[in-house]
Amino acid sequence: MERRDFLKVTVLTGATAALSGCEKPAQKLVRFLPEERLEPGVATWKPSVCTLCPAGCGLLVRVMEGEAEVVRNGQRGLIRMGLAKKLEGNPQHPVNRGKLCTRGQAGLQITYHPDRVRGPLKRSGTRGSGQFQEIEWDEALGEVAQRLKELRSQDRAGTIRFLTGRSRGQRAELVNEFLTALGSPPAIAFDPLDEPVLRQANLLSFGRAAMPSFDLARAGYVLSFGADFLGTWNSPVAQAAGYGEMRQGHPGSRGKLVQLEQRMSQTGANADEWVPVRPGTEGALALGLAHVILRQKLRPAKEDGAAQLIAGWAQGLPDYSPEDVEKKTGVAAKRIERLAREAAEHAPAVAMVGGAPLAHTNGLFTALAVNALNSLLGSVGSAGGMFFTPQPQLTERERRVAAEDQGSGHRLGAALDGAHALLLHNANPVFAAPAAWGMRERLEKIPFIVSFGSFVDETSALADVILPDHSPLESWLDDVPESGTGQALVSLAAPTMSPLHDTRAMPDVLLEVAHRLGGDVGKALPWQNFEERLRVSLPKVTARTKTKELEDEQRSWNEMLEQGGWWSDELEKLASMSGRPASEESAKKFTAAPLAAAQFAAPQFDGAENDFPFQFQPFVSQAFLDGSLAHLPWMQEMPDVLSTVMWGTWVEINPQTAASLGIVQGDLVEVRSQHGKLQAPALVTPANSPGVIAMPMGQGHDNFGRYASGRGANPMAILAPMQVSQTGSLAWAATRVSVSKVGQARLALFSGGLQERPEELKQR
């Protein structure tokens, strides 16, 4: 061999050896036998349930054969199995009828996310350090059962707490049955997307502590007080379908949508008329409209039900003349009179309220005022109006729980302060609650925390043990959607694919822990798994709705699985779903709010106006909602509907406000309240009222996987712990802030965003 050739071989061999030394040790992967018979290249569609927002839409999941790396019996290997490839809406499901929003489409990424917790973990470092070690399920379950057993033996079962996010159906029932068997208090619900103020108002006005549904398809006129019903509020897919029918389903009549708010939402951008209103004065505006209708006798006067809750109603609301309301709201008196006449003359008309108007200190009054306006318009339980989706009958305990905002600061704080053990499922209060509530500090004092999280978020990072749940597509699911349809329904779904990782369903884990505890706890939860519980319990749930179709003999288990649940064949009569006002005696059982003499009080704000001149208005993100979807890359790269911003947070400032502060688009600004400060790029936009600083929720995670962590800022960090009067709910729109330029920033825009209209085109 020539010397030159020898050197070439030597160099190549050495380089190869060096590179191989940098590689990770090869994992031993076995090949498992296929778990099911699938024909290559042929899709199977399986029904499921979307769990990403409160709407509860039905899904169809396209499953095809593929190869995946999985864990079976503690061993990692490769297998040919059915893999979920695409999500679509279930055409038969009464809520979404085949439609699915972008958030629902992104649900697929939860299953295949690279940052999923793949097996049980035990904390190995200091609390909050994020240091965990892998353990076996037997060890993890044994430790949880032993800790709970010790607390029971010490008569401290009452100090065991279970904190959930949005939860309903049999999962919620099972959790509370588990807690009852332990001798512990009911689960605490913490859902930032819930509307507890509206629930309490609906209980007082209609006897139903529930979210309303709307027959938009037959409406002729819609007044929306801050409710982004086409974007993020309530049941957006169902409401968008109804809105589309209102626009295009009646030749010669398109209906009219009027949106009244401070920051233009997706619904506001679609409205025929957008009316900017001073923050916290929407209730006065609703009664100003009612005053005109009563004074001009445009509709028959209503002096019962919801109307009785409003002071001065019987006298024609003398304190709410258009001129007086103009002073409160900034909406011109002539415009108020015109809107009132239009609403009365273009029946059927309906009003709705949600979002920021209910997040002021006077939010309960605002909701009661809009309910009274609906009563006057004749829209309650009528075609083109509002109603309540049929639900299983509630016990008094369930109704009380529904009426209370358990996730409010003082209730949640009081419950956690005395806890010796905390179980967490689908709740992240360290991120989603105001920093002023001190959730991190409270949780750090709890001796034992168990998380069922599929991801290590800010709250799960404080856990002692993580018992990862299956993804929704790998789980048995049931749901009872609360709004969006006039049909009684119960959704049901079997797993659409086998688990990829060494995870277990949260209900199955609770059942296993109950069996390990034995005694009364084991007897109270006799089922071997959640599937068995569903088979036994669903017929009882459906029978409680008292409709003839819901007898369990008429719908077999297999039929429910095939179509994705059970629902009545026909719409119920809307009049039967209108509810009735709560009596004074029954209302006092569920709320401290008065039944009579509700009257406008100016909203209160935290922070002196001289030091903090702007009202701070966080809004629910189109992509991330409250932040629970920020870990999904499809959501990060999706442009915001109005601003077109991607991969970040922004602060919306009106052009007039920005000019007065010397701020231009892209400047890095500091937003400061009495409770903290944050920095984000400025977005100068006419979609925001002067004097209002708006910012999307959802970004600013410290701990939520590679796509969310360290990205943007969290507006909850600077909110004041203000409460909605007489409810205890968080008044998240009651914080004042200051804004100042601190530097330059990069703002990723897909396009130019909204532009201000020429002055001559603006509607007065």
Residue ranges and their predicted role:
Residues A343-L416, E482-S483, G565, K588, ...:
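A glycine-rich, hydrophobic/aromatic-adjacent loop/helix-cap motif
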Residues R127-E134, H291, R295-V331, T496-A582, ...:
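N-terminal leader/propeptide and maturation segments of large enzyme subunits in energy/redox metabolism
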Residues M1-L298, D304-G305, L309-G312, E323-D324, ...:
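N-terminal export/assembly segments and adjacent metallocofactor-ligating motifs
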Residues P186-V197, S253-L257, L376-Q393, I446-T459:
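A generic structural motif
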Residues T159-R168, D324-V331, G354-T361, Q393-L394, ...:
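Conserved short loop/turn motifs at secondary-structure junctions
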Residues P47-V49, T159, N176, S224-A227, ...:
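A cross-kingdom feature strongest in bacterial/archaeal respiratory oxidoreductases
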Residues D215-A217, A343-A344, A415-D417, L443:
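Extracellular/periplasmic catalytic domains that process cell-envelope and extracellular macromolecules
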Residues V70-R72, A84-K85, R299-K302, I336-E337, ...:
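Acidic/polar loop patches that form or flank catalytic/metal-binding clefts of enzymes
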